[in-house]
Curated annotation (Swiss-Prot):
Catalytic residue positions: 311 (proton acceptor)
Record-level Gene Ontology MF annotations: S-adenosylmethionine-dependent methyltransferase activity
Organism: Alteromonas mediterranea (strain DSM 17117 / CIP 110805 / LMG 28347 / Deep ecotype)
Listed name of the protein: Ribosomal RNA large subunit methyltransferase M
Chain residues that bind S-adenosyl-L-methionine: 193, 226-229, 245, 265, 282
Top-level taxonomy: Bacteria, Pseudomonadati, Pseudomonadota, Gammaproteobacteria, Alteromonadales
Annotated EC: 2.1.1.186
Gene giving rise to this polypeptide: rlmM
Pfam families found in the cross-reference section: FtsJ (PF01728), RlmM_FDX (PF18125), RLMM_N (PF21239)
Amino acid sequence: MSDTSILAYCRPGYENDTANELTSRYGEAGFYGYPVSKKNSGFAHYHLYDAAQLEQTVTQFAVHDSIFPRQLVAVFAAINDVEKEDRVGQVLDALKEVEKPFSIFGAVDVEYPDTEEGKTLAKFCRKFTVPLRQALRKAGWLTAKENLGKPKLHIFFASFEICYIGFTLPSHASRDHLGICRLKFPSDSPSRSTLKLEDALVNMLSNKQQSKVLRSGGRAVDLGACPGGWTYQLVKRGMYVEAIDNGLIADSLMSTGLVEHHAADGFTYRPQFGRVDLLVCDMIEQPDRVAKLMGDWLVKHWATHAIFNIKLPMKRRYETVVEAMTSLNSRLDALDDAFAVKVRHLYHDRDEVTVTIVRTSKDEV
Ligand SMILES: C[S@@+](CC[C@H](N)C(=O)[O-])C[C@H]1O[C@@H](n2cnc3c(N)ncnc32)[C@H](O)[C@@H]1O
């Protein structure tokens, strides 16, 4: 059955926020449609009124530039009555019905929602991939060898009965299965929060941005640092850190000689030795208060770059993030420098989003 929609994978519980984001972003760009989402399903749809716009939406929106989606799949077919006996045949039939959006796909991924129900599909999806891949190659849908430079075919099982068929472009998609990048907890880190910053460093900054922001020997300030998971990431990369928090910081960090701990209020603390390369902040505070504080540090040149979390309220989460970021962005826009700003709800974030702001001089842009 033909179906034309954008399918966004997301953290369970965030379907409504994801749907609001899709509606707002695609609608503003003239891709009109309507959202469909079900609480705790782990995904949301945005159905396009004009099917001809599907390819254009894929080239226009990258998942890395969105907030809540972990993956954005352009869906061109759906099967609503998957039959146990001939699933491969049904997928091939569904593909036959559509015009090939790209002559050939370079890879196929069989996926499922990141939910408890989704976990029951994991084993089946893994096993199903093998015969499906063979059949797709035989039918000319897939390159003979995996080619990750070409569009990828996604077969997403929402349940054992319903599956969506769509594609992503490598430049605009997450390379990770289910759009999830799982990181290994470093056992010598003082807290699990360390994974949030590592996720941001690895998945939100390009290699070039990483070497610029995380200079060995560079200086950083960590607001709300204790017990030290974020400071740990910076110290690991050879940075000097002013760790600000009334709590206790791990001795293992203090003994590196790279950390100064100040028991102070993060809202009034100012850098001890002039401008720092990087400001990070993980204080649990009102979104607009944190955004204002980050803006002050960047506008006043106390920090060159910033990475911080915005804690999400229970309701109007997408709107709250947009409001906080709109006022911050307008302050940055007034400066002579240019700023690369990203906001993502990362896999290791729970009820928060991560913001990275990398400064470049306008000549570099
Ligand atoms: C989520 S924890 C930070 C965890 C830390 N990033 C880590 O990886 O270990 C939040 C911290 O912010 C601190 N905090 C909250 N409000 C603060 C303020 N106004 N000034 C300084 N620290 C604050 C709390 O004491 C708490 O330790």
